[in-house]
Amino acid sequence: MAETSAPAKATAALKKGALVRVNRHAFSSSTEAAASDPSPPDYIFEGPGELLAVKEGYGQVRWRMPVPDVWLRIDQLEPFS
C-alpha cells in the first residue's frame, strides 16, 4: 500500500462543517502569509471558523464575523477545541 501525504491525512480529519482555526506556525511560515497583511487578525488563530468546503488540499472557512470567506491550505488548519 502506498504512503499518503500529510495534507491527505489532514483532509480526512477535517470535513465540511468542522469548526477550525488557523495554526499560527504553519500559516506564518507559508507563502500565503508572505503575500498577505503582515499582521493577520487574531480571530483566525483563536477560531472558531466553519469549514464550508474542502477541495484539492484547500478549505473554505467562514468566520463568525462580518468578513469574507477565505480559502486556506488544509495543512494550515486545525480542529477547534
From Swiss-Prot:
Assigned protein family:
Belongs to the complex I NdhO subunit family.
Indicate the quaternary assembly. NDH-1 can be composed of about 15 different subunits; different subcomplexes with different compositions have been identified which probably have different functions.
Its chief place of residence is membrane
Places the protein is found? Cellular thylakoid membrane
Query: Which top EC class applies here?
Result: translocase
- Molecular functions per Gene Ontology: oxidoreductase activity, acting on NAD(P)H, quinone or similar compound as acceptor; quinone binding
Q: Give the matching InterPro entries.
A: NdhO
Q: Can you supply one Gene Ontology CC term for this chain's record?
A: plasma membrane-derived thylakoid membrane
Q: By what name is this protein known?
A: NAD(P)H-quinone oxidoreductase subunit O
The alphabetical list of record keywords is: Membrane, NAD, NADP, Plastoquinone, Quinone, Thylakoid, Translocase, Transport
Q: What is the lineage of its organism?
A: Bacteria, Bacillati, Cyanobacteriota, Cyanophyceae, Synechococcales
Reaction catalysed by this chain? a plastoquinone + NADH + (n+1) H(+)(in) = a plastoquinol + NAD(+) + n H(+)(out); a plastoquinone + NADPH + (n+1) H(+)(in) = a plastoquinol + NADP(+) + n H(+)(out)
Q: What is its EC number?
A: 7.1.1.-
Membrane topology (UniProt)? Peripheral membrane protein
What is its biological role? Answer: NDH-1 shuttles electrons from an unknown electron donor, via FMN and iron-sulfur (Fe-S) centers, to quinones in the respiratory and/or the photosynthetic chain. The immediate electron acceptor for the enzyme in this species is believed to be plastoquinone. Couples the redox reaction to proton translocation, and thus conserves the redox energy in a proton gradient. Cyanobacterial NDH-1 also plays a role in inorganic carbon-concentration.
Domain of life of the native organism: Bacteria
Q: Report the source organism.
A: Prochlorococcus marinus (strain MIT 9313)
